[in-house]
Amino acid sequence: MTQRNAIVVGGGIGGLTAASALARQGWRVQLHERQPEIRAVGAGIYIWDNGLFALDAVHAYSEAIEGAHEPPSIDMRGQSGKTLMRIKINGESQPRCLTLLRDQLIKALVNAAKDAGVELVTNSSVVAVRPEGEVHFEHGDHSTTDLVVVADGVHSRLRDSVDLSYSRIRMSQGAARIMIPQSSHELPAEDRGRILESFHGSRRLLYTPCTPELVYLAFTCDSDDPAISGAYINTSEWSRSFPTLSDALRATEGVPATRWDTFEYVRLASWSRGKVAFLGDAAHAQPPYLGQGGGTAMTNAIALANAVSSDMELSEALATWERITRPGIESTQRTSYQQRLLNYVPDRVRNPLVRIAGLTSNVAKSQLKATEIRPTLGSTGGSR
């Protein structure tokens, strides 16, 4: 059988996973990244069961999770620090979720891609793709391939080049992210190791241990909130909102955030056009309230590679991939998007609502449904 060729656009989580998965299915794969090097932008990341499954499938699991934190629970709390809802994780018969550094994840995926034989091309900007499989580069060159996978992020410039209709919602909220040393602050003994998500007004503060040395803080608020000014956090403002975490917040004084990200929701009319397939934030961006942006990108990449490597014609394979995979991912998107509504409920109403929700197993199940997503066509063969 003649070896098929694929070009992947974008060196992020979804693109690297797709490239590795395709190469392990026998494709000759080039991945193009417009930056001078493939690197992470961000801080920490949550990898749930579904993402761990995908990492295993592309043989990146062991390197990615080395030194990762295994929290016992995710606690949702009010301003007073009282726990309103606790989701237990990583115990027997409980969902798995590891927290790790984003740059470690990217390095593991880069190494897995190289090991699989993927050709990584940096400083390579793709300006257009065509349904016939043409890929056009910034300096006028172009290539024709059997499959194009576009994973160039929420700001994708390539969706329009195949005349693909889509909806894109920029939300009023976003987040700034900062890493601080574990040694910079003290928590009560019973809180150590836990993920803490605290609410006050329209602000959320997410406290996530990532490694034995580092904690990841995410400051979620409206884009015009004076508690964030440029690259810096107004420590006193956030301490007033979350006094029980003031010790940790003092450690952010003078530390620039990695960047501000406005949350977005993207829905494509179709995930493919001709020989071009879209995945990750370019196809199904979601706000990060469930911690599933990376996980859904990776599992969708595995599903795509499995589908197009089957005996089906490409058009049938892409249609089957979308038909089987899209409902689960869009369910995750909707649940995450609905979570934004909590931002604008007064504390006196939100706190009892969250407390009652914590007593109802169906609420936790709906939030964790995405962790059960697994590709169902074929197999890339895991490393564990």
Swiss-Prot record:
Enzyme type, top EC level: oxidoreductase
UniProt cross-references to Pfam families, sorted A to Z: FAD_binding_3 (PF01494)
GO molecular function, a single term: 2-heptyl-3-hydroxy-4(1H)-quinolone synthase activity
Keyword flag Zinc: no
E.C. numbers: 1.14.13.182
Induction: Up-regulated by PQS.
Catalytic activity: 2-heptyl-4(1H)-quinolone + NADH + O2 + H(+) = 2-heptyl-3-hydroxy-4(1H)-quinolone + NAD(+) + H2O
Keywords in alphabetical order: Monooxygenase, NAD, Oxidoreductase, Plasmid
Sequence similarity: Belongs to the 3-hydroxybenzoate 6-hydroxylase family.
Task performed by this protein: Involved in the degradation of the Pseudomonas aeruginosa quorum sensing signal molecule HHQ (2-heptyl-4-quinolone) to anthranilic acid. Probably catalyzes the hydroxylation of HHQ to PQS (2-heptyl-3-hydroxy-4-quinolone).
The name this protein goes by in its record: Probable 2-heptyl-3-hydroxy-4(1H)-quinolone synthase AqdB2
Organism: Rhodococcus erythropolis
Gene responsible for this protein: aqdB2
